[in-house]
């Protein structure tokens, strides 16, 4: 198989000028699109493997295991902990190794937890500690997001980064809903025949192939790994050592945007991880897996809308009002929850949670759009009155710092995949319900409104965006 060629006839591109309209129209746009549309399925698979435990835990006890509700919430939360931690390192990998190489290698790493899970669930004597380790390894999928977003940011001009990053993240985020929709289907029959192992027999006499929750992703992981290796590009202009990228830790706006992204993406991925078990514990009469995929689906689909709105209206304005709506939706969810195990309305709860997922998706897109604008503005100000070559270097530095911040903030945001499921588990253990956790989220969103308004949205803000 031959490498898909660029105008430079190779996988490494040495001349990359997306801000040059002539270059962009001649060859840049086509190359950027190709890398984006290979990146998207790779990221979709990463999210599917990362969040697969959110579905598996709902059925584990039905096939012979005896784990407590708190233990099950831990299995849902642990991929978030490991994935978020890996993102811290993955966010610096693309400038060191190249986007093509790293996308292929990180996608291939998903084979480890996918295969191991498939074998482990077939043995009812598999200890809980083994499942803990597999759940942690599923964090490989969570780590991929940071490097993917960093990589795509290098390919697009500033004016189109919001839409491009929104598409990459939004369609990649669909991996959660695709997984939560497909897994209940594929575990209901022997997809792989004798190669997939024997079914587990449930108490009512029906059969379940829970191993398919892991095995189903293997052929797709292999295919996308090959496509990424031969179809994507490495940009030499995006190369930077860790020390060059580490300057972001001195940037105030890096930490501010990490705080905001923890509220938007952290909420999206945390609610996605906890939603199936939250439905099951709050509304036991409802078949959770019939509805669980809907929240991540709408949240992922509207993420590009958040980037587009930020391009048109300004990222800070969209983000500010989005946080206000998130608070309103949380109170709506609380209104429809059962009180003391009685009352409540599942469909009211579901509707308000869908609206909450929509706001997390819009916020994901708008906050990510803010980052490149903020750092380009800062570097443009620093280069005022300087020589043309110094201004050009300032723009390159802005691009590298933006990419590093995109990756690092996504790492911090991913901790929501750990904290939100664990918050629900702790709230239920202490109070018998999830309400305490929701009130904590409201307090956090209020702090984000203050940060967004003061530094980015108010009249006279130092860095409007």
Region spans (language model):
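Hydrophobic core of transmembrane alpha-helices in multi-pass small-molecule transporters
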Residues: 127-143, 344-364
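C-terminal ends and interior cores of transmembrane alpha-helices
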Residues: 108-124, 324-342
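Cytosolic juxtamembrane N-terminal segment immediately preceding the first transmembrane helix
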Residues: 1-48
């Amino acid at each position: 198989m031959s490498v898909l060629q660029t105008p430079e006839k190779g996988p490494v591109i040495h001349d990359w000028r997306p801000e040059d309209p002539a270059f962009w129209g001649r060859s840049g746009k086509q190359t950027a699109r190709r890398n984006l549309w290979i990146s998207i399925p790779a990221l979709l698979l990463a999210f599917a493997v990362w969040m697969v435990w959110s579905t598996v835990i709902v059925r584990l006890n039905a096939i012979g295991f005896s784990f407590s509700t708190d233990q099950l919430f831990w299995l849902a939360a642990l991929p978030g902990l490991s994935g978020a931690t890996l993102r811290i390192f993955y966010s610096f990998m693309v400038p060191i190794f190249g986007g093509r190489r790293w996308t292929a290698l990180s996608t291939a790493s998903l084979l480890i937890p996918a295969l191991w899970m498939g074998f482990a669930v077939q043995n009812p004597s598999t200890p809980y500690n083994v499942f803990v380790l597999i759940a942690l390894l599923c964090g490989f999928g969570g780590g991929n997001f940071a490097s993917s977003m960093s990589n795509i940011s290098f390919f697009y001009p500033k004016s189109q980064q919001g839409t491009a990053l929104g598409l990459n993240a939004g369609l990649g985020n669909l991996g959660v809903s695709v997984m939560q929709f497909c897994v209940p289907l594929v575990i209901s029959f022997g997809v792989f025949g004798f190669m997939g192992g024997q079914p587990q027999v449930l108490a009512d006499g029906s059969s379940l192939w829970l191993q398919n929750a892991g095995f189903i992703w293997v052929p797709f992981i292999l295919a996308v790994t090959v496509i990424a290796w031969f179809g994507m590009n490495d940009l030499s202009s995006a190369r930077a050592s860790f020390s060059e990228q580490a300057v972001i830790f001195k940037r105030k706006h890096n930490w501010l945007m990490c705080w905001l992204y923890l509220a938007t993406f952290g909420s999206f991925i945390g609610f996605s991880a906890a939603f199936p078990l939250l439905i099951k514990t709050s509304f036991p009469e409802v078949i959770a897996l019939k509805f669980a995929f809907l929240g991540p689906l709408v949240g992922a689909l509207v993420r590009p809308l958040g980037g587009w709105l930020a391009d048109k209206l300004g990222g800070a304005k969209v983000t500010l009002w989005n946080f206000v709506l998130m608070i309103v939706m949380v109170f709506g969810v609380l209104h429809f929850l059962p009180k003391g195990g009685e009352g409540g309305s599942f469909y009211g709860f579901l509707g308000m949670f869908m609206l909450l997922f929509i706001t997390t998706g819009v916020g994901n897109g708008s906050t990510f759009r803010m980052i490149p604008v903020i750092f380009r503005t800062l570097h443009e100000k620093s280069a005022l009155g300087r020589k043309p070559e110094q201004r050009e270097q300032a723009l390159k530095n802005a691009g590298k710092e933006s990419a590093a911040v995109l990756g690092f903030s996504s790492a911090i945001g991913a901790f929501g995949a750990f904290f939100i499921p664990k918050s629900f588990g702790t709230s239920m253990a202490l109070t018998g319900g999830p309400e305490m956790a929701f009130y904590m989220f409201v307090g956090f969103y209020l702090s984000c409104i203050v940060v967004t308004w003061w530094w980015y949205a108010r009249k006279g803000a130092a860095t409007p965006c």
